[in-house]
Amino acid sequence: MAIPYRRPQSTPEDGCAAYLDVIAGQGGVLLGALLLLDGRGRPLEFVHNRTEPPGGWMWPDELQFQACIAAVAHSLFDACRREPDLVVCKCTLGPRDYLRVEVGPSIPMVVVWPAADGAIQWDWVNDPPTHGMRSHSLAPELKTRGFLVEPFHRIVRGLQILYPTDLTKDETDDPVP
């Protein structure tokens, strides 16, 4: 016989945020990860991938990096089993226009970076969530609980464990934006 209990009301914790990061490793290798957390910071899924940039004299360095970021992001999106309500990324992945056009998630995406005073700033890459979307209340909840930057530390730790020969300490000294 089941024990009856009172179910909590729907809260922002019911939503899911996906933290996207791509880190340059040794020899030009790029390592990417997507960490999905609920509004309380509990991990739900971790998806990772690794790629080498296209080579040759026809590929300028900046185009190589941008092509790889989009390719890694898309492969992570395809491999993800859950459907997050929000994507959070660091400003190091590229300008907002690039992220909106080339990475192009159809769900709200926010980019984060540190301000001069140490506070974390954020800006919407595409349209911010509207009232009624779970991400509308999830995004402020993540900020209040301190989960705009901390998950990127988890991503780096995960990538270091999974790809120990591809990452050195120098490449992961400052894993936050």
List where the protein language model places each region.
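N-terminal accessory regions of nucleic-acid-interacting proteins
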Residues: 1-4
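Two-metal-ion RNase H-like nuclease active-site motif
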Residues: 6-26
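Structural motif
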Residues: 15-18, 85-87, 107-111
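N-terminal nucleophile
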Residues: 28-31, 89-96, 113
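A glycine-rich, hydrophobic loop/mini-helix early in the fold
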Residues: 29-80
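Ordered, amphipathic secondary-structure segments that act as subunit-interaction surfaces
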Residues: 67-99
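Short Gly/Thr/Asp-enriched flexible loops that form oxyanion-binding sites at enzyme active sites
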Residues: 94-111
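C-terminal folded domains that constitute the principal catalytic or ligand-binding module
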Residues: 114-177
